[in-house]
Amino acid sequence: MSITAERKAEVIKTNARKSGDTGSPEVQVAILSERIVNLTNHFKSHGKDNHSRRGLLKLVSTRRSLLDYVKKKDEARYRALLEKHNIRR
């Protein structure tokens, strides 16, 4: 259900704004999106796993907060994030 360290490093590398960037909103949204996709796939075979579903809702809420922050700061970056990670608004 969680992502591997190698996959996380790859996601960070592809979404970093500069080298060594691990905390920008873009990177955080990318990591959360990866975890959300993994959990969504998990629920296809474990539909009654309500404990993990609660964690999924928390991840979605955190990602929504980060996206709201990016939208407030820079609308173009926000739209690029939505398009890049196929996030519905």
From Swiss-Prot:
Name of encoding gene: rpsO
Keyword set, alphabetical order: Ribonucleoprotein, Ribosomal protein, RNA-binding, rRNA-binding
**Entry-linked SUPFAM superfamilies:** S15/NS1 RNA-binding domain
Q: Per its UniProt record, what Gene3D superfamilies does this chain match?
A: 6.10.250.3130, S15/NS1, RNA-binding
Q: What is this protein called?
A: Small ribosomal subunit protein uS15
Tell me a Gene Ontology molecular-function term this record carries. rRNA binding
The source's domain of life comes to: Bacteria
Q: Which InterPro entries match?
A: Ribosomal_uS15, Ribosomal_uS15_bac-type, uS15_NS1_RNA-bd_sf
- Give GO cellular component annotations, separated by semicolons: cytosolic small ribosomal subunit
Q: Bias category Basic and acidic residues: which stretches?
A: 1-11
Q: Which residues form a coiled coil?
A: none
Q: Per the similarity annotation, which family is this?
A: Belongs to the universal ribosomal protein uS15 family.
Relate the assembly described in the record.
Part of the 30S ribosomal subunit. Forms a bridge to the 50S subunit in the 70S ribosome, contacting the 23S rRNA.
Q: Per its UniProt record, what NCBIfam families does this chain match?
A: S15_bact
Q: Does the entry feature the keyword Ribosomal protein, yes or no?
A: yes
